[in-house]
Amino acid sequence: MTLWTARAAHRAWLDAEARRLVDFAAAADHPEHGFAWLDGSGAPLPEQGVHTWITCRVTHVAALAHLEGIPGASALADHGLRALAGPLRDPEHDGWFTALDSRGTVADSRKEAYQHAFVLLAAASATVAGRPGARELLDAAAAVIEQRFWEEETGRCRESWDAAWHADEPYRGANSNMHLVEAFLAAFDATGDRVWAERALRIAHFFVHEVAAPRDWRLPEHFTPDWQVVADYNTDDRAHPFRPYGVTVGHVLEWARLLVHVEAALPDPPSWLLADAEAMFAAAVARGWSVDGTEGFVYTLDYDDTPVVRSRMHWVVAEAISAAAVLGQRTGDERYEHWYRTWWDHAATYFVDTVQGSWHHELDPTLAPPPGGTWSGKPDVYHAYQATRLPLLPLAPSLAGALATVG
């Protein structure tokens, strides 16, 4: 079977889609404070203010685009770096606020591991891209993470603190730690410091090999401060965008991909990384893809595999595409090519918005954009953009590291 990625037309399609996503994200440029939340047509939503995670993701994508030689991307990356070094950073207690309002006033002063993971990711990618101030930002973010979030005794990270770092939240989460794996791998590529790869391995070992594997690859997302599973967390807010109840199908796929990146970072990787990656992928497909009579991935499952939230999120199919591309490259197994083609067809048919730009972020169970839902507008291009880049890159700990080897 000839891989789609070996065909010039497919590679050109991926490149064109990547450029389209970068162009859409460029409209989020807030003059002073970072990157705004965009509505469905790509216009900033002032009422949403500026979120640190969105600013970081656009900065990361812009740094990758600059590494690829896309004119104008460097200015976007530099704008994001200035915002992260300036208004989004706490000048009194250090660390990064969660959000500002449209005037630049702090709207959410919490210090979250999720936000800090993306600060580190953006800074690391921009460091590889050679952007001014990026390495200083990376070092600052790394210091805060090491001092406030990293638990050396457990090998994973706390969730969040108040603004002054006095009280940490009595909750631990898989989502933030998963993104810290990604950020730590990017920091390893940017600095060469192996401690980041070793920490990524420790986090992955706990969540995948210790928690998911004994549960037949069903990954609980929510934990007590001493890392006991809280199975009924958010039963009253099951579609929460960051902490939904039950098993999040897209995260199972994302972990499958990240395990391969962890493997690429280690000189002598343990064999369980690839074995667990393939098992996580297979479980997500069997339990999450078209299981309710309609094409697509459901958002969440109960622990008996019953669909809970049947909405289709754009980031889930994007992560599925990325996982299929990475595992296909790693193993050479044609099953992954089948799924890679299937999910790009699905994404192009239902999610890619060729009229207003970017991707629909959410579809209802009939595959139509809902009037309301978990997500409003189109704030994020990060998952979709990475799905267009990973299929064309060699395996590496991070996207920036991979681009640096082919640039």
UniProtKB/Swiss-Prot annotation:
Catalytic site positions: H251, H383
Gene3D superfamilies for this protein: 1.50.10.10
Function: Catalyzes the reversible isomerization of D-mannose to D-fructose. Shows weaker activity on D-lyxose, but cannot use N-acetyl D-glucosamine.
GO biological process, one term: carbohydrate metabolic process
Keywords tagged on the record: Isomerase
Activity across pH: Optimum pH is around 8.0. Stable between pH 4 and 11.
Subunit structure: Homodimer.
EC numbers: 5.3.1.7
Enzyme class: isomerase
Top-level taxon: Bacteria
Organism listed in the record: Thermobifida fusca (Thermomonospora fusca)
Full protein name: D-mannose isomerase
Pfam families xrefs: GlcNAc_2-epim
Thermal dependence of activity, per record: Optimum temperature is 60 degrees Celsius.
GO MF annotations, alphabetized: isomerase activity
Record keyword Isomerase present: yes
Record-stated family: Belongs to the N-acylglucosamine 2-epimerase family.
Catalyzed reaction equations: D-mannose = D-fructose; D-lyxose = D-xylulose
UniProt xrefs under InterPro entries: 6-hairpin_glycosidase_sf, 6hp_glycosidase-like_sf, AGE/CE
PANTHER family, A to Z: N-ACYLGLUCOSAMINE-2-EPIMERASE
Entry keyword Isomerase: yes
Activity regulation remarks: Significantly inhibited by divalent metal ions such as Cu(2+), Cd(2+) or Ca(2+).
